[in-house]
Amino acid sequence: MRRYLMVACGLAMFGAYLGAQGGSGDQKGTPAEARLRATVANLRAGRIATPTDYDRLNAEQKAYVASILSGPRGDISGPLGVMMVSPALGDLTQKAMAYSRFAGREGFSSVPPKLNELAILMVGKLWSAEYVWNAHHAYAVRMGLAPETVEAIRRGVRPADLPKDEQAIYDFTDEFLRTHTASDRTLNAARDVLGGDRGIVDLVGTMGLYQISSMMVALDKTPLPQGVKPYFQ
């Protein structure tokens, strides 16, 4: 029953996406369908057999792609492409990841964007997740992290002269990832910066979700975009 409901809801979103883009769920040749086809065709498969032929997708997979393209992310490359082979898992994950990815927007994670990106980069470095790093290092600078901070994380050294808020989140993330716990002192410092327990839970959620993301691209050995050199070699 749950699988049936997921397919039914997904097909409804698929039809709504086509309609919103100027077509209908049963109408071929629309700009929306062309975008879906191009998105799938441009996926770069690694070791997991990510489908790149739109006509070979089943109903769940088409609904999964349409759901992502109609949401705030609008892109299905990297770990979300890997999870196309398990679209029910992918759909649940991409919705949770969107909540974390777009921190600071209404209805999304309460963690300030630059601190959210700080944690994401630290998780990406932990896993040497090239694809995650490529997707986030420049965005992290746009959100307010100093380029020197980003470079220090890439090199695996503690950034120097961190502002108080970044220092608290760096210490919490580092300690939690290394020891799988956090001292009261470290937790309380991060809690103060994030304004309470919701911020802490949102931050740990981001750390967990981006470990999933990093694990997926590590499993797949997802290629970087053409022309992009590896970051961790």
Please state what every model-predicted region is.
Residues 115-153:
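Mid-length scaffold segments of soluble, non-membrane domains
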Residues 191-192, 208, 216-233:
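Acidic, carboxylate-rich catalytic segments that either coordinate divalent cations
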Residues 76-82, 112-126, 199-204:
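Alpha-helical scaffold segments that form or flank carboxylate-/histidine-based iron centers
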Residues 22-110, 232:
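Mobile cap/lid helix-loop segments that border enzyme active or cofactor-binding sites
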Residues 1-6:
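Bacterial N-terminal signal peptides that target proteins for export
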Residues 163-204:
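Acidic/histidine-rich alpha-helical segments that form the ligand environment
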Residues 145-172:
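A contiguous pocket-lining binding segment that forms or flanks enzyme active sites
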Residues 7-16:
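Bacterial N-terminal signal peptides
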